[in-house]
Protein backbone atom coordinates (compact mmCIF):
# COMPACT_ATOMS: atom_id res chain seq x y z
CA UNK A 1 0.00 0.00 0.00
CA UNK A 2 1.26 3.46 -0.86
CA UNK A 3 2.05 5.80 1.97
CA UNK A 4 1.39 9.50 1.53
CA UNK A 5 3.77 10.77 4.19
CA UNK A 6 6.17 13.63 3.51
CA UNK A 7 9.26 12.28 5.25
CA UNK A 8 12.70 13.83 5.47
CA UNK A 9 13.94 11.66 2.60
CA UNK A 10 11.45 13.39 0.27
CA UNK A 11 12.96 16.85 0.90
CA UNK A 12 15.90 18.72 -0.58
CA UNK A 13 17.88 19.59 2.52
CA UNK A 14 21.26 21.09 1.62
CA UNK A 15 22.38 23.95 -0.61
CA UNK A 16 24.21 21.37 -2.75
CA UNK A 17 20.92 19.59 -3.44
CA UNK A 18 19.38 22.85 -4.63
CA UNK A 19 22.42 23.75 -6.77
CA UNK A 20 22.26 20.36 -8.50
CA UNK A 21 18.65 20.97 -9.48
CA UNK A 22 19.44 24.36 -11.02
CA UNK A 23 22.07 22.80 -13.31
CA UNK A 24 20.61 21.22 -16.48
CA UNK A 25 17.05 21.46 -15.24
CA UNK A 26 13.67 21.30 -16.94
CA UNK A 27 11.21 24.07 -16.15
CA UNK A 28 7.46 24.28 -16.05
CA UNK A 29 5.94 27.55 -15.08
CA UNK A 30 2.87 29.66 -14.69
CA UNK A 31 2.55 33.39 -14.03
CA UNK A 32 2.34 32.55 -10.31
CA UNK A 33 5.16 30.08 -9.69
CA UNK A 34 7.77 27.95 -11.44
CA UNK A 35 8.77 24.34 -10.85
CA UNK A 36 12.29 23.32 -11.80
CA UNK A 37 13.08 19.61 -12.08
CA UNK A 38 16.14 17.45 -12.60
CA UNK A 39 16.49 13.67 -12.64
CA UNK A 40 17.89 12.09 -9.51
CA UNK A 41 19.37 8.64 -8.92
CA UNK A 42 17.04 7.82 -6.05
CA UNK A 43 13.92 5.67 -6.06
CA UNK A 44 11.63 8.58 -5.18
CA UNK A 45 11.04 12.25 -6.02
CA UNK A 46 12.17 15.04 -3.69
CA UNK A 47 10.84 18.56 -3.13
CA UNK A 48 12.50 21.86 -2.30
CA UNK A 49 10.79 25.21 -1.81
CA UNK A 50 11.97 28.75 -2.50
CA UNK A 51 9.49 31.36 -1.33
CA UNK A 52 11.34 34.69 -1.16
CA UNK A 53 10.28 37.38 1.29
CA UNK A 54 10.70 39.83 -1.57
CA UNK A 55 7.92 38.07 -3.50
CA UNK A 56 5.46 37.15 -0.74
CA UNK A 57 5.82 39.74 2.00
CA UNK A 58 4.00 38.22 4.96
CA UNK A 59 5.07 35.11 6.85
CA UNK A 60 1.45 33.96 6.80
CA UNK A 61 1.42 34.13 2.99
CA UNK A 62 4.77 32.35 2.63
CA UNK A 63 3.77 29.60 5.05
CA UNK A 64 0.42 29.13 3.30
CA UNK A 65 2.09 28.74 -0.09
CA UNK A 66 4.67 26.28 1.28
CA UNK A 67 1.98 24.26 3.04
CA UNK A 68 -0.08 24.00 -0.16
CA UNK A 69 3.00 23.09 -2.24
CA UNK A 70 3.98 20.31 0.20
CA UNK A 71 0.42 18.98 0.28
CA UNK A 72 0.15 18.91 -3.51
CA UNK A 73 3.52 17.12 -3.75
CA UNK A 74 2.55 14.66 -1.02
CA UNK A 75 -0.68 13.73 -2.82
CA UNK A 76 1.05 13.44 -6.22
CA UNK A 77 4.33 11.80 -5.19
CA UNK A 78 3.40 8.31 -6.41
CA UNK A 79 2.64 9.59 -9.93
CA UNK A 80 5.80 11.71 -10.17
CA UNK A 81 9.04 10.50 -11.77
CA UNK A 82 12.24 10.17 -9.74
CA UNK A 83 13.27 13.80 -9.96
CA UNK A 84 14.26 16.60 -7.65
CA UNK A 85 11.75 19.47 -7.82
CA UNK A 86 12.20 23.06 -6.66
CA UNK A 87 9.12 25.28 -6.47
CA UNK A 88 9.81 29.02 -6.77
CA UNK A 89 6.98 31.36 -5.81
CA UNK A 90 6.22 34.61 -7.61
CA UNK A 91 4.46 37.66 -6.22
CA UNK A 92 1.06 36.87 -7.74
CA UNK A 93 0.89 33.45 -5.99
CA UNK A 94 -0.43 35.09 -2.83
CA UNK A 95 -3.54 36.30 -4.70
CA UNK A 96 -4.71 32.80 -5.69
CA UNK A 97 -7.20 30.72 -3.75
CA UNK A 98 -6.14 27.34 -2.38
CA UNK A 99 -8.15 25.57 -5.07
CA UNK A 100 -6.49 27.56 -7.86
CA UNK A 101 -3.04 26.77 -6.46
CA UNK A 102 -3.83 23.03 -6.31
CA UNK A 103 -5.11 23.05 -9.91
CA UNK A 104 -1.97 24.81 -11.13
CA UNK A 105 0.27 22.39 -9.25
CA UNK A 106 -1.56 19.40 -10.75
CA UNK A 107 -1.11 20.83 -14.24
CA UNK A 108 2.61 21.51 -13.73
CA UNK A 109 3.29 18.12 -12.09
CA UNK A 110 1.74 16.44 -15.15
CA UNK A 111 3.82 18.56 -17.51
CA UNK A 112 7.04 17.66 -15.68
CA UNK A 113 6.10 13.97 -15.54
CA UNK A 114 6.16 13.60 -19.31
CA UNK A 115 9.32 12.01 -20.71
CA UNK A 116 11.89 14.65 -21.62
CA UNK A 117 12.87 15.14 -25.22
CA UNK A 118 16.56 15.61 -24.68
Swiss-Prot record:
One of its GO terms (biological process) is tRNA 5'-leader removal. It holds the Pfam family Ribonuclease_P. InterPro entries: Ribosomal_Su5_D2-typ_SF, Ribsml_uS5_D2-typ_fold_subgr, RNase_P, RNase_P_CS. It is an enzyme of class 3 (hydrolase). GO terms for molecular function: 3'-tRNA processing endoribonuclease activity; ribonuclease P activity; tRNA binding. The keyword S-adenosyl-L-methionine does not apply. Transmembrane segments: none annotated. Its EC number is 3.1.26.5. Gene3D superfamilies: 3.30.230.10. PROSITE patterns: RIBONUCLEASE_P (PS00648). SUPFAM superfamilies: Ribosomal protein S5 domain 2-like (SSF54211). Consists of a catalytic RNA component (M1 or rnpB) and a protein subunit. RNaseP catalyzes the removal of the 5'-leader sequence from pre-tRNA to produce the mature 5'-terminus. It can also cleave other RNA substrates such as 4.5S RNA. The protein component plays an auxiliary but essential role in vivo by binding to the 5'-leader sequence and broadening the substrate specificity of the ribozyme. Belongs to the RnpA family. HAMAP family: RNase_P. This is Ribonuclease P protein component. It comes from Vibrio parahaemolyticus serotype O3:K6 (strain RIMD 2210633).
Amino acid sequence: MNTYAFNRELRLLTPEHYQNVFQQAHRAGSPHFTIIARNNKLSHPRLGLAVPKKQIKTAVGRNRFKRLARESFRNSQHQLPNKDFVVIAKKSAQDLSNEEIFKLFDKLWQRLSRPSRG
